[in-house]
């Protein structure tokens, strides 16, 4: 397949799920997966791409189960935010070990652990080819890390949100349950809403749509997929106007 000589994106927001870091363990952080992701991000930096990263926290804490057991939702969400900071610390460390300059910012103040999130500072760091990891979600309860990814993507003026998942893209049905499910190469925002396709939660998705922020869903477990996406190759599902 013919590839572009240059990346098709200048600045991206990479959304990683916490589950992507846990590997086969089902919990926690798999060091080998973390290091592989750091190497893939390093490749993008070497291509001259400015990279912002938002990581979920589901590998360390899931508030939904405890909420059902009676825990206050705000408390659960605050715990989830701290889980994303823990993942961010691990990712920053992996990037530093890969000789990539990275800065960790948090939407909630954690002095001595990481920097407070600042929109202007984040953009300045990106322009200086630093990877910026944006943790603690939006800093508010009731908002998912997908919402944080879209919000931060809009704020840092990213060209696209790249949503890394465990499947190759957006399918007509759940490929794990329906072997006849086929993958979409491209969709409009309205097609996703009309067909009720599960891309991300509605608040996050409508935020991206309202600000015309493209979303590309791809499989981060597939080696080289991230690079193929930024080089404009056929990879994953693109959602745009």
Curated annotation (Swiss-Prot):
Pfam families in alphabetical order: AA_kinase (PF00696)
Family matches, as Gene3D superfamilies: Acetylglutamate kinase-like (3.40.1160.10)
Catalytic activity entry: UMP + ATP = UDP + ADP
Protein EC: 2.7.4.22
Subcellular location(s) of the protein: Cytoplasm
A GO cellular component annotation in the UniProt record: cytosol
GO molecular function: ATP binding; UMP kinase activity
Keyword terms: Allosteric enzyme, ATP-binding, Cytoplasm, Kinase, Nucleotide-binding, Pyrimidine biosynthesis, Transferase
Entries under InterPro entries matching the protein: AceGlu_kinase-like_sf (IPR036393), Asp/Glu/Uridylate_kinase (IPR001048), Uridylate_kinase (IPR011817), Uridylate_kinase_bac (IPR015963)
Positions contributing to ATP binding: 15-18, 58, 62, 165, 171, 174
Biological or metabolic pathway of the protein: Pyrimidine metabolism; CTP biosynthesis via de novo pathway; UDP from UMP (UMPK route): step 1/1
Activity modulation comment: Allosterically activated by GTP. Inhibited by UTP.
Biological processes annotated in GO: 'de novo' CTP biosynthetic process; UDP biosynthetic process
Residues given in the record as UMP binding sites: 57, 77, 138-145
Listed SUPFAM superfamilies: Carbamate kinase-like (SSF53633)
Region (Involved in allosteric activation by GTP): 23-28
Main subcellular localisation: cytoplasm
Catalytic EC class: transferase
Function per UniProt: Catalyzes the reversible phosphorylation of UMP to UDP.
Family from the record: Belongs to the UMP kinase family.
PANTHER family: URIDYLATE KINASE, URIDYLATE KINASE PUMPKIN, CHLOROPLASTIC
NCBIfam families: pyrH_bact (TIGR02075)
Assembly, per entry: Homohexamer.
Protein's name according to its UniProt entry: Uridylate kinase
Species in which this protein is naturally found: Enterobacter sp. (strain 638)
């Amino acid at each position: 397949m013919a590839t572009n000589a240059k990346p098709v994106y200048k600045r991206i927001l990479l959304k990683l799920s916490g589950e992507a870091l846990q590997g086969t363990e089902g919990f926690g952080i798999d060091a080998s997966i973390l290091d592989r992701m750091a190497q893939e991000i390093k490749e993008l930096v070497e291509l001259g791409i400015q990279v912002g990263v938002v990581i979920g926290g589901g590998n360390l804490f899931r508030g939904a189960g405890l909420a059902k057991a009676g825990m206050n939702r705000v408390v659960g969400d605050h715990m989830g935010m701290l889980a994303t900071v823990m993942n961010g610390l691990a990712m920053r460390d992996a990037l530093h070990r890969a000789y990539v300059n990275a800065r960790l910012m948090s939407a909630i103040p954690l002095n001595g652990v990481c920097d407070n999130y600042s929109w202007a500072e984040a953009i300045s760091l990106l322009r200086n080819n630093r990877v910026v990891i944006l943790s603690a979600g939006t800093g508010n309860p009731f908002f998912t890390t997908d919402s944080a990814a879209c919000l931060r993507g809009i704020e840092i003026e990213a060209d696209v949100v790249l949503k890394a998942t465990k499947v190759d893209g957006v399918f007509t049905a759940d490929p794990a349950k329906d072997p006849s499910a086929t993958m979409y190469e491209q969709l409009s925002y309205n097609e996703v809403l009309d067909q009720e396709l599960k891309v991300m939660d509605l608040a996050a998705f409508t935020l991206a749509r309202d600000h015309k922020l493209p979303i590309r869903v791809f499989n981060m477990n597939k080696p080289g997929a991230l690079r193929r996406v930024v080089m404009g190759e056929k990879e994953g599902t693109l959602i745009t106007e």
